[in-house]
A protein has these predicted regions:
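N-terminal auxiliary segments of SAM/dcSAM-dependent transferases
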Residues: 1-24, 35, 39
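Class I S-adenosyl-L-methionine
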Residues: 3-15, 166-202
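General small-molecule cofactor/ligand-binding pocket signal
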Residues: 31, 111-113, 182-184
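Conserved SAM/SAH cofactor-binding pocket of Class I
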Residues: 44-121, 126-129
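Glycine-rich phosphate-binding "P-loop"
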Residues: 126-138
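Short "lid" loop at the C-terminus of a central beta-strand within the Rossmann-like core
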Residues: 133-135, 162-167
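A short glycine-rich, Lys/Arg-flanked "PGG" loop and its adjoining helix->strand segment in the class I
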Residues: 141-153
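Conserved beta-strand signature within the Rossmann-like core of class I S-adenosyl-L-methionine
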Residues: 154-161
Length: 202
């Protein structure tokens, strides 16, 4: 049976690697492995998110949903050292890599968690995510609905999705589901959506 990056316990044989994240304000060397999302490079969607998302708030609880080996969580933690960054993933190997990478990068404000971990707070300031589209539309919608509801009033989520993986239909669904969304960047076939928890929404 094949192993997927959204499996809780990947069965793929270990193939350790290293990915360098080079941004104008952050440089990271991150350990990777098989069985996690994009283990061989910083994928272009995640790069778009890291380069174009609005700066995170200086403090509060920030979430990397579907953290993989930790590039988003570690960049968030670097940019907001007084905040707590929750790196959430169903994949045990991904969580282990993220914790190790945060430790090696000197980022004590990163906390890893499973999606059902009660320690993750319910008033999140920001969510950044390259969501696991391949889990299927129904599962994706349920996941996003659950986590977006945990944004504090005025909180924002930045979601990056490939156009050929349904970015435009996801944008439409967010609007129809009552989540105001705007496309704030596009590059290399990816869309970056900014979703706001408007307390006035119905």
């Amino acid at each position: 049976m094949s192993s997927h990056y959204f499996d809780a316990q990947p069965t793929a044989a270990h193939r350790p690697g290293l990915v360098r994240v080079v941004l104008p304000d952050v440089y990271l060397e991150l350990e990777t492995d098989s069985g996690v999302f994009s283990p061989g490079r910083l994928d272009p969607g995640t790069r778009l998110l890291l380069e174009e998302a609005p700066p995170p708030p200086a403090d509060g609880d920030l979430l990397d949903l579907g953290c993989g080996y930790g590039p988003v969580a570690c960049v968030l933690a670097s940019r907001a050292p007084q905040a707590t960054v929750w790196a959430v993933d169903v994949n045990e190997r991904a969580r282990d890599l993220t914790a190790r990478n945060a430790r090696h990068a000197g980022l004590p404000n990163v906390r890893t968690a499973t999606p059902d971990d009660p320690a993750v707070p319910g008033a999140l300031a920001v969510i950044w995510s390259n969501p696991p589209i391949r889990v299927g539309k129904a599962a994706l919608h349920d996941m996003l609905r659950s986590w977006l509801a945990r944004l504090r009033p005025g909180g924002q989520a930045c979601l990056v999705v490939g156009r050929n993986l349904g970015a435009d239909s996801l944008h439409s669904w967010l609007e129809e589901d009552g989540w105001p969304a705007a496309r704030i960047a596009a590059r290399a076939g990816y869309r970056l959506l900014l979703v706001t928890n408007d307390p006035e929404r119905t």
